[in-house]
């Protein structure tokens, strides 16, 4: 029972000062970031070199001339998660992002798995990006043989291992920049992001000129705008959705933002909007230059310009790809130390990772550890086969953020904070309740489901049962979303079983959604966390649709990816059982209301005097 209880204990949030409460005080990160910094982080982390390749592959195999629509639909889908992140990041502006929100709203067990999955995401993501830089860099200098010998790829004799010194060196350079300070590293990211955006603008402007000159030949086809049908366009949307992953990095930097309530939602939203516009305009131009079936799947943009006699554009486009990869690499190295620091502050990881350098005010130990691990992977391993694992961490985090938003709106945790151990012994009369006596998110609904008001014929849910109904409804919608996603993706299932799963899943989803729409949201949401920030619209519909999309993408990642992820998650469970659970800052935590804490502090101050 003790182990199960530890999985559902939740970190409390002190609404009075906007910080997650633990038993210990930690060094804070520098409040140095403003709105332009967040735009640089968001756009730089999102627009990787994938756009220089994806447009060819998706247009040839799925979308055809409707490629821009695929990017638009994928952008709208990503925006659903962005709305959820925008509200929670402005409510709880602290390091940790999805891990932090899950710990406050759902529980320690889920938060640990989210944090553990994000560690995997950023490490493998950074290594994958770094391995992709050297081939593009070599193309700028004239080919693979033109890089200096010390940086060129080599195969270890007798082993099927190709080492990439250039990738490791670049990881160490980026790690060094991140150690200098968040403002310095963000400035550097802004420079390379700006260079990449200028290359994309060149593609749009020069490509549009060529398209008007040649008559947009890519759209004058007998197959029409949807050669693969609407299904092909939607399949293309699912593929290019992963080109929008990266805006969540902005939320990871929340503790270092000067005005988080205003700048975080703007940074997340405008970054995603800019990326969507750039993706769509590049897609429109490239499809107009070359018919979709004639696109080069490996180098679609440079090949499109070469087919019109502009050979030199290939060098500029390769430079843009290198800039995009460098910016994405920094977008992988920056957030992970903040995740490690947040988990170490909560006692789930060793305190080594919570150390913040006093001069640079960055989590230096976590940054160095992240850089070393990513450099080793990038040097020795071809991690391209592990790239799907990055998507698992991201999509699970997106899903839990949407669930956390539903909990914040409908089942707000009690306004309590942990009582410092120094005050526990002399203040037993003031102590409210321990973590063991906290009401669970789900519970048995009492027989007196409604309270009768004075007006005849009017009935309302009492507060206690409203919370329980909301908790069960959230769970029903999650189960329904999973069943629908699984049934829609399992083409090998017998038809009757598949349709039955769809029916049951749809029923669960519909019942949960109707209940959430009909009952009132929790009034305590207005004072939970920072108030006055961004408010996500269309709740509960928006987060529920967000959960459905993310679960569908998760189910379709493939069995091999899930096997690899399961091994990593199993290792995480072992670490949690033998270290995190025992060293958590919530072990034996005693909670009191915020008002009682102030009274206890005053009483203790008088007694000391």
UniProtKB/Swiss-Prot annotation:
It comes from the Eukaryota. Expressed in roots, stems, flowers, and leaves. It is found in: Mitochondrion membrane. Coiled coil: none annotated. GO terms for cellular component: endoplasmic reticulum; mitochondrial membrane; nuclear envelope. GO terms for molecular function: transmembrane transporter activity. It is a multi-pass membrane protein. InterPro entries: AA/rel_permease1, CAT_C. GO terms for biological process: amino acid transport. The keyword Disulfide bond does not apply. Keywords: Amino-acid transport, Membrane, Mitochondrion, Transit peptide, Transmembrane, Transmembrane helix, Transport. Its main location: mitochondrion. The chain crosses the membrane at residues 38-58, 66-86, 104-124, 161-181, 190-210, 226-246, 270-290, 314-334, 361-381, 388-408, 474-494, 499-519, 534-554, 558-578. Pfam families: AA_permease_2, AA_permease_C. Residues 1-14 form a transit peptide. Belongs to the amino acid-polyamine-organocation (APC) superfamily. Cationic amino acid transporter (CAT) (TC 2.A.3.3) family. Permease involved in the transport of the cationic neutral or acidic amino acids. This is Cationic amino acid transporter 3, mitochondrial. It comes from Arabidopsis thaliana (Mouse-ear cress). The lineage of its organism: Eukaryota, Viridiplantae, Streptophyta, Embryophyta, Tracheophyta. The gene is CAT3.
């Amino acid at each position: 029972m003790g182990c199960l209880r530890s999985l559902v204990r939740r970190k409390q949030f002190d609404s009075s000062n906007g910080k997650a409460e633990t038993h210990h005080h930690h060094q804070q990160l520098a409040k140095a970031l403003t709105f332009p910094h967040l735009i640089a982080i968001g756009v730089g982390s999102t627009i990787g070199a994938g756009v220089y390749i994806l447009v060819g592959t998706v247009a040839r195999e799925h979308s055809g001339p409707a490629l821009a629509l695929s990017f638009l639909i994928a952008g709208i889908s990503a925006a659903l998660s962005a709305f959820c992140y925008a509200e929670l990041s402005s409510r709880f502006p602290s390091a940790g992002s999805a891990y932090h929100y899950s710990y406050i709203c759902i529980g320690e067990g889920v938060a640990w798995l989210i944090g553990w999955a994000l560690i995997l995401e950023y490490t493998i993501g950074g290594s994958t990006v770094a391995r992709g830089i050297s081939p593009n860099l070599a193309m700028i200098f004239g080919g693979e043989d033109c890089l200096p010998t010390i940086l060129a790829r080599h195969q270890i004799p007798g082993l099927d291992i190709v080492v990439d010194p250039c990738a490791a060196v670049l990881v160490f350079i980026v790690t060094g920049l991140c150690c200098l300070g968040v403002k310095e590293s963000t400035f550097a990211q802004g420079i390379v992001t700006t260079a990449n955006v200028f290359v994309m603008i060149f593609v749009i402007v020069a490509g549009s000129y060529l398209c008007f000159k040649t008559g947009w030949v890519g759209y004058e086809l007998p197959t029409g705008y949807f050669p693969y049908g609407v299904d092909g366009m939607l399949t293309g949307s699912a593929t290019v959705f992963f080109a929008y992953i990266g805006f969540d990095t902005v939320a990871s930097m929340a503790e270092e933002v000067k005005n988080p309530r205003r700048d975080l939602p703007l940074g997340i939203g405008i970054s995603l909007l800019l990326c969507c516009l750039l993706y769509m305009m590049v897609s429109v131009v490239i499809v107009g230059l070359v018919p979709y079936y004639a696109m080069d799947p490996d180098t679609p943009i440079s090949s499109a310009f070469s087919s019109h006699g502009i050979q030199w554009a290939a060098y500029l486009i390769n430079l843009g790809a290198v800039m995009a990869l460098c910016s994405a690499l920094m977008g992988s190295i920056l957030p992970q130390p903040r995740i490690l620091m947040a988990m170490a502050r909560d006692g789930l990881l060793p305190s080594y990772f919570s150390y913040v350098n006093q001069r640079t005010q960055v989590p230096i130990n976590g940054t160095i550890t992240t850089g070393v691990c990513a450099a080793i992977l990038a040097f020795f391993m071809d991690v391209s086969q592990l790239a799907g694992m990055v998507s698992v961490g991201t999509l699970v985090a997106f899903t839990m953020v949407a669930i956390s938003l539903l909990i914040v709106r409908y089942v707000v945790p009690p306004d309590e904070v942990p009582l410092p151990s120094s005050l526990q012994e002399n203040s037993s009369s003031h102590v409210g309740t321990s973590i063991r006596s906290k009401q669970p998110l789900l519970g048995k609904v009492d027989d007196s489901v409604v309270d009768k008001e004075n007006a005849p014929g009017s009935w309302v849910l009492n507060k206690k049962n409203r919370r329980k109904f909301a908790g069960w409804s959230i769970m029903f919608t999650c189960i329904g979303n999973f069943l629908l996603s699984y049934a829609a993706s399992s083409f090998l299932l017998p038809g009757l079983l598949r349709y039955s799963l769809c029916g049951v899943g749809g029923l669960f989803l519909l019942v949960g959604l109707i209940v959430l729409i009909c009952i009132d949201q929790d009034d305590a949401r207005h004072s939970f966390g920072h108030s006055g920030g961004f408010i996500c619209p269309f709740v509960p519909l928006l987060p529920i649709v967000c959960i459905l999309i993310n679960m569908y993408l998760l189910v379709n990642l493939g069995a091999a990816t899930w096997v690899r992820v399961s091994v990593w998650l199993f290792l995480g469970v072992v670490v949690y059982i033998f270290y995190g659970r025992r060293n958590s800052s919530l072990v034996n935590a005693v909670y009191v209301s915020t008002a009682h804490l102030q009274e206890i502090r005053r009483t203790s101050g008088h007694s000391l005097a």
